Every structure is written in C-alpha cells, then in structure tokens.
C-alpha cells in the first residue's frame, strides 16, 4: 500500500518542494494552501496531488481538510504530516501592528498546533506516524527586527519536543527542520544587498534551496530516521552554529 503525506503551505516554496519530492517517491500527497489557487492547481496537476484550500489557523477548516483528504485516498490516517505553513513579517516591535502579531502567531504557531492535533487523533489509534514541523534558524538564534516571528518559530520547537515525548510511547515521531535563508517568496522582502549579506554570513557562502530543505523533511519522515525523535535538524549552511 502506498504511503501518504499531508503537507500544509504546499503551493509554493519549501512546501511545494516537499509536494514534488514525496510525490516523486510514490506517496499519495495531499496539500493545504492558503490563497494561491493558480499555483496550487498547477502543482496538483504536475504531481497528481490533492490540493485543498484551508486556513491552518482555523481548526475546523483543518479538520475538514483532513477528512476530505482521507476520504479521497480511502485511508484511515496519513503516514506523514508536514507542518510547513507559515508567514513572515519583520520590523521593530514598536512598528508591529496587532494584525501582524495575530497573523504571525495564528498561522505559524497556532496553525502548527491545529494541524498536529487533527493528525494525532488518528495516528494514536494506529500506533504509528511521523510529524515534521518547519521552524527557522531565527527560532534558535537572536535577530533584531525578527522578535515576533522568532517567537513563533521557537514556540514550534518547544511544542515539537514536548509532543515527541508525549507521543513516542504511541509509536509517533515528531521532529523539526530549521531552515536558514532559503530562496523562496517569503524572503522576497529582503533586498538584494540583505540577501548577499546573509549569504556572506553563512559559512557555506550561499543561501539554500527549497529542494534542500525538502530532502531533510523527507529524511526525517522516512524509515531511515526511525529512531530519531524530538530533534531539530538545521538546514542553514552553518548559519546558526
């Protein structure tokens, strides 16, 4: 029987790279996306994945998305869940609006919790499963003008580690991938000069690719990582060392 994966934030960037990689490796793939219908449908057609529009900050929408995807594939659970959906907003804390704060926490942290809760309900019954969450190097390292974003990403790491301890006895593994500066739309707010400076600050001397992060996600989700639980795997070229 084919293995299955549910990926959030799947229409672009790291999420899209994950959709393509898991599909290439024979998985039945469902992915949730927030707004870009055109990109989602194009990716779904390319990979034969199921695209579902859903707001991860809304637990009811996520529950409905899981039910729709499980029914579509005729499966009781997903073998792998990738919590990738996220947004960024940088600036001085005094310049962050209430909406900025609510959106960052709602999508990045609450969204990850919502997706995990809905996935775990079925995984516990089956006594198996793997959850991979996407954090950030800013969840591990201090950065000016990234305070709220960093708080959400650090929160993901704390949540994942505690969840790994909680779910380990049920045969469910929970791990985190912590990307550095990656060539995605999310980093388009940075100027070319900023990107160049970040690349120079990275020991490997460049920024990363979405496909490189996807490979790390796939590894942690695979049987090759069967004894890895509660860990944070940095894919940052050594930036956070």
Q: Can you say where each PLM-predicted feature lies in the sequence?
A:
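Residue(s) in the substrate-gating loop at a strand-loop-helix junction
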Residues: 136
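Conserved glycine-rich Rossmann-like NAD(P)H-binding loop of the short-chain dehydrogenase/reductase
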Residues: 25-40
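Alpha-helical segment proximal to the catalytic Tyr-Lys
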Residues: 121, 165-169, 226
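Conserved glycine-rich cofactor-binding loop
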Residues: 11-12
């Amino acid at each position: 029987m084919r293995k299955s994966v549910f990926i959030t934030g799947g229409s672009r960037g790291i999420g899209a790279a994950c959709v393509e990689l898991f599909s290439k490796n024979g998985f039945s793939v469902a992915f949730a996306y927030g707004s870009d219908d055109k990109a989602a449908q194009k990716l779904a057609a390319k990979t034969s994945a199921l695209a579902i529009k859903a707001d991860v900050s809304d637990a009811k929408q996520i529950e409905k998305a899981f039910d729709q995807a499980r029914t579509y594939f005729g499966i009781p659970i997903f073998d792998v869940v990738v919590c990738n959906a996220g947004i960024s907003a940088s600036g001085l804390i005094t310049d962050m609006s209430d909406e900025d704060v609510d959106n960052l926490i709602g999508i990045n942290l609450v969204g990850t919790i919502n997706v995990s809760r809905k996935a775990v309900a079925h995984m516990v019954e089956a006594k198996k499963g793997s959850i991979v969450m996407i954090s950030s190097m800013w969840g591990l390292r201090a950065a000016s003008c990234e305070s709220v974003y960093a708080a959400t990403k650090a929160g993901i790491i704390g949540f994942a580690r505690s969840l790994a301890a909680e779910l380990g006895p049920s045969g469910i593994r929970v791990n985190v991938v912590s990307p550095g500066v990656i060539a995605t739309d999310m980093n388009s707010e940075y100027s070319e000069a900023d990107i160049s400076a970040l690349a120079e600050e990275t020991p490997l001397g460049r920024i990363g690719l979405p496909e490189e992060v996807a490979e790390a996600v796939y590894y942690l989700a695979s049987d090759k990582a069967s004894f890895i639980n509660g860990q944070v795997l940095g894919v940052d070229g050594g930036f956070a060392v």
